[in-house]
Amino acid sequence: MKTFVAKPAEVKRDWYIVDAEGKTLGRMAAEIAARLRGKHKPEYTPHVDCGDYIVVINAEKIAVTGNKRTDKMYHHVTGYVGNLKSTNFETLVGSKPTRPVEFAIKGMLPRGPLGRAMLKKLKVYAGAEHPHAAQQPKELDL
């Protein structure tokens, strides 16, 4: 018996919608990352993008436990000498409400071209409205 290898053209991708309101950031991100990779499918192949499309709504209402709302820091380099910029979770949600969800999920995906292709199937929106009604996404309860 030969080992099954999924072919990119034969992968069936579904659309799912996740309501992030009141969900814990890391637990939700781990489940979404696994679905973006396609690990929930029996035909999962590590070197092929087998995952589904995921639409996350209400990202601004995500929950974090403990003191992470004020203590969790996000860093980025501006490209200028000595300019490492840092901001905490609360400030980042105030200015760019989708970023904490995107950063958490991106950190759980593989690095390289395959991981970037998987991340393109993630759509995150701050509010309850999204432009993907035509794809008829199924509700995903995490």
From Swiss-Prot:
<protein>
    <recommendedName>
        <fullName>Large ribosomal subunit protein uL13</fullName>
    </recommendedName>
</protein>
<dbReference type="GO" id="GO:0022625">
    <property type="term" value="C:cytosolic large ribosomal subunit"/>
</dbReference>
<dbReference type="GO" id="GO:0006412">
    <property type="term" value="P:translation"/>
</dbReference>
<dbReference type="InterPro" id="IPR036899">
    <property type="entry name" value="Ribosomal_uL13_sf"/>
</dbReference>
<dbReference type="GO" id="GO:0003735">
    <property type="term" value="F:structural constituent of ribosome"/>
</dbReference>
<dbReference type="InterPro" id="IPR005822">
    <property type="entry name" value="Ribosomal_uL13"/>
</dbReference>
<dbReference type="GO" id="GO:0017148">
    <property type="term" value="P:negative regulation of translation"/>
</dbReference>
<comment type="similarity">
    <text>Belongs to the universal ribosomal protein uL13 family.</text>
</comment>
<dbReference type="InterPro" id="IPR005823">
    <property type="entry name" value="Ribosomal_uL13_bac-type"/>
</dbReference>
<dbReference type="Pfam" id="PF00572">
    <property type="entry name" value="Ribosomal_L13"/>
</dbReference>
<comment type="subunit">
    <text>Part of the 50S ribosomal subunit.</text>
</comment>
<dbReference type="InterPro" id="IPR023563">
    <property type="entry name" value="Ribosomal_uL13_CS"/>
</dbReference>
<dbReference type="GO" id="GO:0003729">
    <property type="term" value="F:mRNA binding"/>
</dbReference>
<keyword id="KW-0687">Ribonucleoprotein</keyword>
<keyword id="KW-0689">Ribosomal protein</keyword>
<comment type="function">
    <text>This protein is one of the early assembly proteins of the 50S ribosomal subunit, although it is not seen to bind rRNA by itself. It is important during the early stages of 50S assembly.</text>
</comment>
